[in-house]
Amino acid sequence: MNPSGSIGVLEQNGEEHLAAPILGPSVNSDNPQERIQARRLRIAARQEARRREALGEYLDGKKESEEEQSKSYKQKEESRLKLTKLLLCGTELVTNIQVAADIREIHRRVEEEETKRQRLEKLENEVKTSQDKFDEITSKWEEGRQKRIPQELWEMLNNQQVHCAGLVEDKNKLISELQQELKIKDDQYVKDLKKQSEDITVLLERMEEQVKSVMKNFRQELNYIEKAFESERQELLTTNKKKWERALQAHNAKELEYLINRMKRVEDYEKQLNRQRVWDCEEYNSIKIKLEQDVQILEQQLQQMKATYQLNQEKLEYNFQVLKKRDEESTVIKSQQKRKLNRLHDILNNLRTKYSKQIKQFQEDNQSLTSDYKRLVTQFKDLQKAIRHFIIIDQDKFREIWLMNEAEAKELAQRAFDVDKIIHSQHLGLPWKIPNFWFLNNVGPISLQQQQKSVTQILEELLLQSEDEGTETAMSEDESYMDLPNQVSAKTTKKILVLLCDESGFLIESKLLSLLLPLEKSECYLLRLDAIFSALGIESEDDLYKMVNFFLRFKAHHLSSAQVSISTHSNAERTSLVSALQHMSLMSQTDRRSSASKSDGDPTELEDQQGSDNGSLMGRELVEQEDLSSPMFIHPNDVLKILDAFVTGLKKPKDARPVQRLKKDTRNNLKDTEYWESLAMVIPFSKQNLWDALFKALEKYYLVLTQRAKLLMENDSLEQQNAEMQSLLQQYLQAKVNLELQVPPTQGFRMPSK
């Protein structure tokens, strides 16, 4: 700590400290802050020395680097050193007040410890002496009880009163001394507060002076640094300007040299072109001579071919004569075959009679089987109606039971949440947030998986419609065509299938056609389409939707291919139809995937996925919506052409994809299990453990409260007994017998107050 005289000099002559040498803090100083500062400066000096060694500088400052340091760098270093010294001096000047205050506080605490120790010793001595006096007084009470003469008893009481007064006087004297000491400490505390306020004012004044001096020196050094940078900038501008002029001169010389070299290269290229022309002329003459020789050789070969032609003509005449002889032999063989044919005709007539008999028998069997088939079909339809009815009833019952159990579970979960809220807010004092679980917002059973229908089921829904099932057929039609485009109706699809059935009869076996004759029209169409689709390889619902869309887009592709070229009409139409089929297969796959994931995905994501596939055809579908929906544009002669293109295009995507198997209309029990398990675990194990710990603590708290209640009851009973005893004592003291006594009992002790 610096003396007060040096502090005044530092306040008045702040700028002189920059030039005068400053004695740094010492490690051997008595001040701990000064020792800490000395260690920090020593560590900083070591780090600076390591940095200089890493940069290749020398510690003694005598040897610098090969390149001379710039003026700006020198000015920055000088300013940094000056400002560092100024800040160190200012910090020391400001912290002197704090150091002096700390020393005063240390001395005060030492004195306070000493006075406290003396006070405690004095109090202990006082306690011992007062205890001895009190013991002496209590021992004399026993002697007073043994005395029977009132005069001696009165003297003893006077002595006891004197001793008690002396004891009380000693206690009062001690209390007055402690109060006087407390008053002195209060005065000392007021003086310390005044001294601290004076130190704070001095500290603030010094800090303001230091801030002003530091600001002044910072501005001055900043001006010096700016001047150094400006002079260095001017020097750099002059040197760079000279370098730029030298670079321009070198660039001009290089450009001149480049022009000379370019002229030389142009002359060399002209010479090479002349040599190339001469070589091409010579090569042309040699090729011409070679081709003339080839022509002569070909003429010789032509003469040889004529000679061989003459020879072959003679051979053919000879063969003609041989064939004539063979024809005569064949006439003889024909007559023999005619006789054999007549014999076979007789056998054929016999077989026809047998065949007619068999046909009649088969027709009778067919009629009986057809009647049985119709009866079974009606029974099957009735069974389907009953199954649908029971499915709807079961679904309604399942939904009612689900909702009832779900409401009960959610009510229990809400009660658990209320209990958790009370525990958090009242017992734990923590904020409670309403949990947001996904299963709490669910109402009703989880949706069934979508079921993909087979081609036969769709054909039954389309063709086997009766007038008695008006509402049911409409519902089934809507369900079966849920994935078709919006512009395609069930009526249009039925017309396309009928047209396909009429024009593709060659794909059906003749035996099957003969068996289908006695059936009804709708059943006949159904079986014929089943055979056609099995021949074409159409097995799934997606393939049927592709074919319908393919037929509807045929006219647009037909017109576009006709405008391109008339000569290549068939090839262009075939390629356009195949490409359209491939594009539609991709569209149908994306549509099926999007419809299968509607219940799990986001509608916006589905639109984004379908947008990339359907974007190219969206404009044309909106314009041609009315044209595509009508099957009148499809000519019967074009049906086979469309089928050919569709089957060729269907082979590629069908080879790559796996065979889709029909799934039963089952529920996803895993989702149901997960849902009910989640409802059962609305309160996690961590909170349940917290509840168990809280329950144990509340049980302990209940035991403590019961014990306190018992103690309070005992206290009330004791108070009641005490009041009864006081009333009895009061009656005893107020009795008339006590007035006749020379020393009444009221003089020996005081009555307790209620």
UniProtKB/Swiss-Prot annotation:
Annotated localization: Cytoplasm, Cytoskeleton, Cilium axoneme; Cytoplasm, Cytoskeleton, Flagellum axoneme
Keyword Transit peptide (UniProt): no
Domain of life the protein comes from: Eukaryota
GO BP annotation list: axonemal dynein complex assembly; axoneme assembly; cilium organization; cilium-dependent cell motility; determination of left/right symmetry; heart development; mucociliary clearance; protein-containing complex assembly
Cellular-component GO terms for this entry: axonemal dynein complex; axoneme; cilium; cytosol; extracellular region; sperm flagellum
Region ranges (Disordered): 1-32, 55-76, 587-616
Coiled coil feature spans: 98-388, 704-743
Keywords: Cell projection, Cilium, Coiled coil, Cytoplasm, Cytoskeleton, Flagellum
Keyword Transcription tagged: no
A Pfam family matched in the record: NYD-SP28_assoc
Oligomer status and interactors: Component of the nexin-dynein regulatory complex (N-DRC). Interacts with CCDC65/DRC2, DRC3, GAS8/DRC4 and TCTE1/DRC5.
Family from the record: Belongs to the DRC1 family.
Function: Component of the nexin-dynein regulatory complex (N-DRC) a key regulator of ciliary/flagellar motility which maintains the alignment and integrity of the distal axoneme and regulates microtubule sliding in motile axonemes. Plays a critical role in the assembly of N-DRC and also stabilizes the assembly of multiple inner dynein arms and radial spokes. Coassembles with CCDC65/DRC2 to form a central scaffold needed for assembly of the N-DRC and its attachment to the outer doublet microtubules.
Name by which UniProt lists this protein: Dynein regulatory complex protein 1
